[in-house]
Amino acid sequence: MDDLENNIFNSVEEEIIYWKSVAMKYKTCSEEAQQELQEFQEASREYEAELEAQLQQIEGRNRDLFSENNRLRMELDGIKEKYEEQHSENYVQICSLEGDLSQTKAVRDQLQKYIRELEQANDDLERAKRATIMSLEDFEQRLNQAIERNAFLESELDEKENLLESVQRLKDEARDLRQELAVQQKQEKPKSNMGSPETERMDTSVKASVAIPSAPLTPLSQRGCASTLTSPLSFRTSLDDGYSGTPLTPCARISALNIVGDLLRKVGALESKLASCRNFVHEQSPNRPLTSVSARMNKTREGIENRLSMASGSSVEKGLIKRLEFGSLPSNTPVQGMHSPQGVVKMII
C-alpha cells in the first residue's frame, strides 16, 4: 500500500485508470481464491467420504479377522491333540525302524563282502579284456594289410581298364591318320585312273604301317597319368566316324589282330595274377568278404567269356568285326552297347 500511495500521477484521469486496474486485479485474485476454496472444500468432502468408506471396510475386516482368529485357535487345539497322538505313533514306529536298521546293517555287511568278490572277478575280466584288445589289434593290423592288398588289386584292375582305353585311343589315332592319308592321296592323285603296281603296293604298305601304331607299355605310375578317359559321346562319335572309312588290306587287319591278341594275353595274365592275389587275401582274412575286387573280376571274366562265345553269332559282333575292317556299319546293328567305355573290349574282339 505504501508503494501505491507514493505513486505520483500527472492528472486525475491517470490516477483513476490506475486505481481501476488495481481494483480489477484484486477482484480477479479474490475470484481465483474463492474458486480454489470451493475446489478445496469439494476435495475435502470427497476425501472425508473416502475415509469413512475405508473406516467401514477396516471395521468389517477387523470383525472378520477376529472371527478367523477364534477359528484358528480352535483348529490349533485340534492340531495339538492330533500331534500328541501322532507323537505316540511315531515313537512306536521308531522302535520298529531301529530293529529294521540292525537287520539292514547285517545285510550291508554281506553286500560289502559280495562287492569285494565282484571286484576280484572284475580284475580278472579286465585282464582278459586287455588280452582280447591285444589280439584285436593284431587282427586289425592283419586286416589293414589285407585292405592295402585289396587296394593294390584295384589298382591292377584300373591298369587293365587303362590298357583297354589305350587300345581305343590307338584305334582313334589310326582313324585320324587314315583320314589324313586319304586327304593327301586325293591331293596327289595322278591324272590317270590306273596307277602302277609299285605305287599300289607302296600305298598298301603305308596303310598297314599307319593303321595300328605300336603302343609301348608304360609303368603303372606313368600309365595312370598318360591314359585319358573318353566320354561316351566322344566314343560313340569315333565309332560312327570309323564306319565310313576305307577298308584295310589283309596285312593291316592281321597286324591289328595280332596287337589286340597280345593285349588280350596280357589282360589274361593280369587276371590270373589278380585271382591268385584274391585267393591269398581270402586265405589271410576268410571272415571279410572281398566284394569290390571279386565282383569286378567276376564281371570282367564273365564279359570275356560271353564275348568269346558270342563272337560269331550276334549281329553286334559282326558289325564290330567289320569295324576292324574299316567298313560300313550294317543298318540292323544296334549301337546301344557301344555308348560306354566298357564296350571297348567288344571292339577288340
From Swiss-Prot:
Chain residue ranges for the region called Disordered: 182-201
Keywords annotated in UniProt: Cell cycle, Cell division, Centromere, Chromosome, Coiled coil, Cytoplasm, Cytoplasmic vesicle, Cytoskeleton, Kinetochore, Membrane, Microtubule, Mitosis, Phosphoprotein
Intracellular or extracellular location(s): Cytoplasm, Cytoskeleton; Cytoplasm, Cytoskeleton, Microtubule organizing center, Centrosome; Cytoplasm, Cytoskeleton, Spindle; Chromosome, Centromere, Kinetochore
Origin species: Xenopus tropicalis (Western clawed frog)
PTM comment: Phosphorylated in mitosis.
Family: Belongs to the nudE family.
CC terms in the record's Gene Ontology section: cleavage furrow; cytoplasmic vesicle membrane; microtubule; spindle pole centrosome
Protein name, as recorded: Nuclear distribution protein nudE homolog 1
Annotated Gene3D superfamilies: 6.10.250.1080
Main localization category: cytoplasm
Gene Ontology MF, one: microtubule binding
Subunit structure and binding partners: Self-associates. Interacts with pafah1b1.
Record's function text: Required for centrosome duplication and formation and function of the mitotic spindle.
GO BP annotation list: cell division; centrosome duplication
Top-level taxonomic group: Eukaryota
Coiled coil: 23-189
